[in-house]
Amino acid sequence: MGARASVLSGGKLDKWEKIRLRPRGKKRYKLKHIVWASRELERFAVNPSLLETAEGCRQILGQLQPALQTGSEELKSLYNAVATLYCVHQNIEVRDTKEALDKIEEEQNKSKKKAQQAAADTGNGSQVSQNYPIVQNLQGQMVHQAISPRTLNAWVKVVEEKAFSPEVIPMFSALSEGATPQDLNTMLNTVGGHQAAMQMLKETINEEAAEWDRLHPVHAGPIAPGQMREPRGSDIAGTTSTLQEQIGWMTNNPPIPVGEIYKRWIILGLNKIVRMYSPISILDIRQGPKEPFRDYVDRFYKTLRAEQASQDVKNWMTETFLVQNANPDCKTILKALGPAATLEEMMTACQGVGGPSHKARILAEAMSQVTNSATIMLQKGNFRDQRKIVKCFNCGKVGHIAKNCRAPRKKGCWKCGKEGHQMKDCTNEGRQANFLRENLAFPQGKARELSSEQTRANSPTRRELQVWGRDNSLSEAGEDRQGTVSFSFPQITLWQRPIVTVKIGGQLKEALLDTGADDTVLEEMNLPGKWKPKMIGGIGGFIKVRQYDQILIEICGHKAIGTVLVGPTPVNIIGRNLLTQIGCTLNFPISPIETVPVKLKPGMDGPKVKQWPLTEEKIKALVEICTEMEKEGKISKIGPENPYNTPVFAIKKKDSTKWRKLVDFRELNKRTQDFWEVQLGIPHPAGLKKKKSVTVLDVGDAYFSVPLDKEFRKYTAFTIPSINNETPRIRYQYNVLPQGWKGSPAIFQSSMTKILEPFKKQNPEIVIYQYMDDLYVGSDLEIGQHRIKIEELREHLLKWGFTTPDKKHQKEPPFLWMGYELHPDKWTVQPIVLPEKDSWTVNDIQKLVGKLNWASQIYAGIKVKQLCKLLRGTKALTEVVQLTKEAELELAENREILKEPVHGVYYDPSKDLIAEIQKQGQGQWTYQIYQEPFKNLKTGKYARMRGAHTNDVKQLTEAVQKVATESIVIWGKTPKFKLPIQKETWEAWWTEYWQATWIPEWEFVNTPPLVKLWYQLEKEPIIGAETFYVDGAANRETKLGKAGYVTDRGRQKVVSLTDTTNQKTELQAIHLALQDSGLEVNIVTDSQYALGIIQAQPDKSESELVSQIIEQLIKKEKVYLAWVPAHKGIGGNEQVDRLVSTGIRKVLFLDGIDKAQDEHEKYHSNWRAMASDFNLPPVVAKEIVASCDKCQLKGEAMHGQVDCSPGIWQLDCTHLEGKIILVAVHVASGYIEAEVIPAETGQETAYFILKLAGRWPVKVIHTDNGSNFTSTTVKAACWWAGIKQEFGIPYNPQSQGVVESMNKQLKQIIGQVRDQAEHLKTAVQMAVFIHNFKRKGGIGGYSAGERIVDIIATDIQTKELQKQITKIQNFRVYYRDSRDPLWKGHAKLLWKGEGAVVIQDNSDIKVVPRRKAKIIRDYGKQMAGDDCVASRQDED
């Protein structure tokens, strides 16, 4: 009976009992064979519940098959039974066991062949990525399969949506699996618009490439024939290598994985970018006092992804910080779970935890008891590998059950231990038999309910046993999906055995609700009426029972009359004969729409906004609307216990007398958790493929069909007021998604997607585009079949409570969808009418621009720049705007364009995409995307100016990138471009301009006006032309400035300027030089700012001054522009600097530059040290560092310090040139002691530690777990010197991070001075000197040597001060106020100065002159008066 319930359902059991044991034999399979098989599996320590599914049977067969050759007859019989059961589960028709074994063998052979075929297909490329495989062609050559548009599309979306948050890195890593450098560059180029991020990335790549070149020097001599050259850093980055070379390196033997190396560099750069965009440390992530544990875990893992550490370190961080930074309530529970708890167990345990701390203690105790047993509130399905521990009731040993126990039978009850009754008659509630091979969720065995939220969190297949009756009303809107039966409590979860109290013949009994049992069987009891004997099959074989008919049973408040069997059953069972009468069913989660759990933001409470007064007609309208909504179950009335409120009001519908209810959810929206938008953009008709049959549907009352989370409903409360407070106000809350609430769109979209998924899988030929409640359904079926499918879809939606009203069901073209008009072979935007007005307000212009932007996607040539100019500045919406002549002209042109209706066509995947761009002038561009000429898919415009100064080539590349990105989003691939620029012009700009970004494949098209560079800067100085040295200076306070030039022919000029800046004066100087020079000119500036602007060759600018410079440049025949560093004593530059600095700059020339340069050549000091020691401006000191070829590669070392106490040192061994360097770092200051040691032994390390302790106060040393540090010699040395030794974990902020960083810096300095020393040990000591005394920065701007002395001195002073304070507190003070002759006190002495003392009398702190205070020592007795004792102590 129980086995039948758990293994085979009724229909399958009939099939089982028809199968013969042997071919043409008489005996057939019976229920007892399943019972026997389950017992045998227990004997072999295999989970018997695997028999319940085909997959489980397949797993058992896999375990048994290897043992068949040597196994016993019993094992073979078990294999045969399980094989037959597998065929029954899989609905494979077999007549006997032999046929079943043949079918199994046939299936195994097929799967083997498939595996072999897959292996053959994959070949050696099994390790190659599936995204971008390098495959072998028919000729045996390794060829590259280009990156897919789908992958590019995914990458662009990730960057646009995540905006360089931590998730970008794992996403990039996944999408770029196995990519070549060319693929990686394509990925980077598609997001080239993010210029700041890309510049950071470029810098990282350059640094890593330089490091690669340093570590992999080029081998001298020619390359041997047939050998490949070794890749340089720039080859790995794909800039100087071809695709074939990259493939060659990656497939060579041995391979050089250039793709993986480049990917690693990019990820390093992305880490930096992520750090910039989300600078949160994992240490800052702490759980709020009331924050749900699940939300805390989400934040924790999001930040963890951004941490720059290896996976091992991240695992350690998770183990340590996740529990450590939880709030006290959760931390108590997590510690009780033990160190080996999984994340799922943690989430389960902390579900709903919060409130008083005693609640957490109670839960912790409960959890510690639960964790001691084998089952921890988790379904068996979650941990498939766990074996059930079988324990004998008789002897108590593990491994067998009482029936098979060989020990003598134990007297008394196995359940409670008392004599006089057996276990089946036991009334003790303590422990229950392990019936039907199910684990109890709680050891106490009491039936407890878990909330549906917990069930969903813990169980992958949420099952609930629900009991209902037809007379019960619906408890929640949106849950009644059956039509005939409405749900009501109780809902009994299957988290544990569903045991309920039932009333039978006036007696109360606990019984198990068993939907798998046919009959109701109860343990021995007296029932009224006649009975007849019967035999039934049970777990332990057959049992004899008494059958009573027409017995009244009450279950959960529902009555039923039926047959009851009474006999020796180990547990009372209510079977299907009674459960069906009371309407009990087993429910899986696919019935009603599952509510999405919603929370408020951590630490926030619901809205409490007062309802404002409403007019009588509005109140009447709201009452009428709410009454109707309440009848439909969308809202329900609430009492005064709900403290939350949101204001409600009513407006009249457009062109109607009907009213519409609006709720102002702004306050609730601020307090509600954030949601991830499922859809970030709307689908575009140009991306639709042409379909034979099309239908457009609209979901009616979309939001009101989806239930709102029960726990969140209280926050949606609103109130309808009454006139003059006649009656109490009516209060409601929402049961469904409200209009205007921030969560409604995301929850509706995700619910709708889940509901449509099964229909899409069943009907792959149907294309469904879903955006909110609009559905576009297309297919290539004949119209009749298509309409049948549409009806199926409507019925499918109706099952889930979504209606598709006929009024909005569009069957015939043109279809109105998402603001578009769709025809069978073309599309357009819905008709656009531009208003005719005499006066335009700001709001009118905004609406007009919106309409024109919408029209521009199919009407080519639309312009809005002049209209947008009218909206500049902060203006009120109702302010009247006067149209300029340019704006009127632009509007008239747009009206002309819109007169003729224009249509777009649909996408054909078999044809290429082509995009053509034209220049319209005034920084505006228009483009068309098509597959066939004159049949546009879509059109558009671009008019964005990314910088203040730009030129047409730069704008053209920006327009191209916009079109490419748009194409990837709509069609998943980039088009071929036709651009109005000649190749020569493009190449001239591309080669010179450092910030030039990638554009896809393109060709020149002669569509005037052509894009051209209006002037060209020369690459070399112009011989014979006059050279102008230009400079400018401005005073920040007075805003006065000068600009001027000095020429190599003795000419000079200076002009005075007012209200200016340094940057403006530098540009003004260049303008002067261009004005006063001939057709050819050389200009030398020391301004990087001016150089950067002019080298980009702008032809338009928002700056009037730059526009004037552009005019002058266009007039010239040749211009050469050069930059020199300022204050370097360069002839003309120094003269003009003196000229413009007079009376403007406070500091002129500095004598210390030469000395600083000499010092830097010897010690390679950083710029802070030089600025401090030689009194140089930072810009000059930085320039000296930048011009040093040994310092410019890596830039500045950061001197961030860990906040540690003064006595802590970190020690570590590092290796260089095959020798060992032992490094000690004073953590608080960064001061280094280092030595080359002959061997990494305990003896050498101990000697070094004793030397260190003899020089500096060492209290604690922190080391790794190296054998030299853990040796007894080092321990003995530390014990003798009184040093505490600690061992750390790598990268723990209080562990080895500081010394690891210092090792790197020390090696860098050694590299800079290595050529100055013959031996490494000399170079090490030189590097230590430079680091400790020639590098400044970090805390206080000191060098490390200055900092350690300062820290130790401060520590000594602080300790001495503390001693004095402690000493002072042993005194009492009696004092007199100015007018009062009486002595007051005693008071506490806080400080004793020369002329006064600071005292504390009660809570008041006072300053009293010394002459009016008597200070006495506290001897523990009361002392008062101006006596000799007090006098003697006066001067103490």
From Swiss-Prot:
EC number, UniProt record: 3.4.23.16, 2.7.7.49, 2.7.7.7, 3.1.26.13
Renumbered residue ranges of the record's region Interaction with membrane phosphatidylinositol 4,5-bisphosphate: 73-77
Regulation of its function: Protease: The viral protease is inhibited by many synthetic protease inhibitors (PIs), such as amprenavir, atazanavir, indinavir, loprinavir, nelfinavir, ritonavir and saquinavir. Use of protease inhibitors in tritherapy regimens permit more ambitious therapeutic strategies. Reverse transcriptase/ribonuclease H: RT can be inhibited either by nucleoside RT inhibitors (NRTIs) or by non nucleoside RT inhibitors (NNRTIs).
Organism expressing this protein natively: Human immunodeficiency virus type 1 group M subtype B (isolate RF/HAT3) (HIV-1)
Cofactor(s), by name: Mg(2+)
Annotated ranges, domain Peptidase A2: 509-578
Residue numbers spanned by region Disordered: 106-128, 446-465
Protein name, entry field: Gag-Pol polyprotein
Disulfide partners: none
Catalytic residues as annotated in Swiss-Prot or TrEMBL: D514 (for protease activity)
Catalysed transformations (reactions): Specific for a P1 residue that is hydrophobic, and P1' variable, but often Pro; Endohydrolysis of RNA in RNA/DNA hybrids. Three different cleavage modes: 1. sequence-specific internal cleavage of RNA. Human immunodeficiency virus type 1 and Moloney murine leukemia virus enzymes prefer to cleave the RNA strand one nucleotide away from the RNA-DNA junction. 2. RNA 5'-end directed cleavage 13-19 nucleotides from the RNA end. 3. DNA 3'-end directed cleavage 15-20 nucleotides away from the primer terminus; 3'-end directed exonucleolytic cleavage of viral RNA-DNA hybrid; DNA(n) + a 2'-deoxyribonucleoside 5'-triphosphate = DNA(n+1) + diphosphate
Cofactor: record remark: Binds 2 magnesium ions for reverse transcriptase polymerase activity.
Region annotated Dimerization/Multimerization of capsid protein p24, chain positions: 277-363
